[in-house]
């Protein structure tokens, strides 16, 4: 399954569209900042399932800051990361992911890309967009 993971778009929808056109994903995950960008992307590509979580700039969102989902038989914990203080390091977020049985932790907020693996557990941050 091809999944496009985006985060911290901050109003820049055009680069997200370019990513969708390039990757041709079967699902899109948006990790917050800004949820309205994800909504716009969902309207542009209504046939592609889109899941998201709010970030620290998504004021007034009623959505939960963390979302556990399963795609292609893989359990993924999605979060923006600000509530787990990921700018100080991903350890608290990693602990939360392991506690809920996730295979992959996806987070944003830091604007720094990260791909790390510990055994069969993956930690990933797409950076910005």
PLM regions with names:
Residues 1-48, 58-65:
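N-terminal active-site segment of His-dependent metallophosphoesterases
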Residues 6, 16-19, 71, 75, ...:
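A generic structural signal for ordered alpha-helices
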Residues 1-3, 68-77, 117-123:
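Beta-strand-turn-beta hairpins that frame and shape the catalytic cleft
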Residues 10-14, 35-39, 57-62, 84-89, ...:
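Active-site environment of divalent metal-dependent phosphoester hydrolases
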